[in-house]
UniProtKB/Swiss-Prot annotation:
Location in the cell: Cell inner membrane
Entry keyword Transcription: no
Name of the protein in its database record: UPF0208 membrane protein NT01EI_2692
NCBIfam families: PRK01816.1 (NF002493)
Species the sequence originates in: Edwardsiella ictaluri (strain 93-146)
Length: 151
């Protein structure tokens, strides 16, 4: 789905980048039809909060009712892996370079911010989805919501 190959990032570092990306992405309803991040972050937050207790409950429940240990452990491991899958996806997405259409919109947003007198740091290399998330967060705080009309 991405236009260019993503740079190699260490496995554990992807989870950290996923957490940072999840915290950075603005929770703006008008972005939801265009970007899947709103749905993925909501599902990942839910999974981080509720899946470990659900895993423990199902594990204890199956063992208490005399079930086999193998399927009980497999179910618990699957439930615990769901938040990790969300963070991994968000981490991969954070380091993915922007496709050409979003790249153009990214530069338009940067120009709007600079035209309104807001200082921005220069972009290092090719902009990624993390760069877009930081820019969108800044635009949501400092510009009116009409910048979302260009999506």
């Amino acid at each position: 789905m991405s236009s260019a190959p993503t740079p190699h990032v260490a496995w554990f570092r992807l989870f950290q980048r996923g957490q940072i990306y999840m915290k950075t992405w603005p929770n703006e309803k008008r972005l939801a039809p265009v970007f899947p991040e709103n749905r993925v972050t909501r599902a990942t937050r839910f999974a981080i909060r509720f899946m470990p207790p659900i895993a423990m409950f199902t594990l204890c429940w199956q063992i208490a009712l005399g079930g086999q240990l193998g399927p009980a452990i497999a179910t618990a491991l699957f439930a615990c892996s769901l938040p990790m899958q969300g963070l991994w996806w968000l981490g991969k997405r954070a380091v993915t370079p922007l496709p050409p259409t979003l790249l153009q919109w990214f530069h338009q947003l940067r120009d709007k911010l600079q035209a309104s007198g807001i200082a921005l740091a220069p972009v290092d290399g090719a902009p990624t989805y993390q760069s877009l998330a930081e820019l969108l967060r800044r635009c949501c705080k400092q510009l009116d919501k009409t910048f979302l009309d260009d999506i």
